[in-house]
Amino acid sequence: MQIDEQPGNAIGAAVEGFDHATASDADIDALKSTIYTKKIAVLKGQDLSPQQFLALGKRLGRPEAYYEPMYQHPEVTEIFVSSNVPENGKQIGVPKTGKFWHADYQFMPDPFGITLIYPQVIPEKNRGTYFIDMGRAYDRLPEDLKKEISGTYCRHSVRKYFKIRPHDVYRPISEIIEEVERKTPAVVQPTTFTHPMTGETVLYISEGFTVGIEDQDGKPLDEELLKRLFDATGQLDESFEHDNIHLQSFEQGDLLVWDNRSLIHRARHTTTPEPTVSYRVTVHDERKLHDGIQAA
């Protein structure tokens, strides 16, 4: 296995010769260290079945299936499927997922530490995923803004981007919203926390899932504060030219693994009617999102 920093990129590394089936514990430790410090590891030359992809995920931590079944792979439920390509006339997975800034499972009480994405069918145009390193973004905040958010908490919810399921057709929207709030109530996390693997300070907000900010007593703060944070970190830049934004491209055989604690991401969906399919596995590693979350 050879790990090389991606040339010209501030974050990321290319990993050649990685085989999850034969990798030693030292190889796995080196890979995970790269994920935490370089944020994105691109495993090159991968050719895996769904079962093998899950096995790779298990080398890095404990996989968890997505809570809504319509996203799950029909044979391997721990695989989340994003696809606009029907199989035998049947929709497998969900098309155009993640077209907004977010961290995976940010709206849940116990988010994942590591995300793995394995593109299956890659469009010719507009391929890739946008990322923002929220540790680096925090470092770049003005000092007065850092002081303003010190000791605050943010509320995260899936409600804004929840996708209607097949069995929701003809149901009253109020009934669907009530179910969403009951199954996935908003969660509160510190606005910033110390990354347990690197010691860096992470700004844990996303335009997609973060819906409010409050003081340490739970009193809501002005929504304008959140908007200023979104703007300062680059999440409101629709040109995607902000200094904080990194576009990670990929080719057939690439498998992306990234640090879900400090990165937020946004899918770059093709604007042309091209087929696109990707698989995702998300895993819990040795530590919780931050040390303020109690171990189960």
From Swiss-Prot:
Gene3D superfamilies: Clavaminate synthase-like
Oxidoreductase in keyword set: yes
Positions that bind Fe(2+): 102, 104, 265
Enzyme type, top EC level: oxidoreductase
GO molecular function: dioxygenase activity; metal ion binding
Effect of residue 269 to Q: Loss of the ability to produce both INBA and succinate from CABA and 2-oxoglutarate
Protein family per UniProt: Belongs to the TfdA dioxygenase family.
PANTHER family from the UniProt entry: (3R)-3-[(CARBOXYMETHYL)AMINO]FATTY ACID OXYGENASE_DECARBOXYLASE, DIOXYGENASE RV0097-RELATED
Miscellaneous comment: Isonitrile formation goes through two consecutive, but distinctive, 2-oxoglutarate-dpendent reactions catalyzed by this enzyme. In the first reaction, an Fe(IV)-oxo species is utilized to generate a (3R)-3-{[carboxy(hydroxy)methyl]amino}fatty acid. Then, its conversion into a (3R)-3-isocyanyl-fatty acid likely proceeds by decarboxylation-assisted desaturation. In PDB structures 6XO3 and 6XOJ, the 2-oxoglutarate seems to be in an off-site binding mode (overlapping with the substrate binding site), which is not the binding site required for the reaction to proceed. The latter seems to be inducible and requires His-269.
Function: Involved in the biosynthesis of a unique class of isonitrile lipopeptides (INLPs). Catalyzes the conversion of (3R)-3-[(carboxymethyl)amino]fatty acids such as (3R)-3-[(carboxymethyl)amino]butanoate (CABA) to (3R)-3-isocyanylbutanoate (INBA) through an oxidative decarboxylation mechanism, thereby generating the isonitrile group of INLPs.
Protein name according to UniProt: (3R)-3-[(carboxymethyl)amino]fatty acid oxygenase/decarboxylase
Protein species of origin: Streptomyces coeruleorubidus
This protein's encoding gene: ScoE
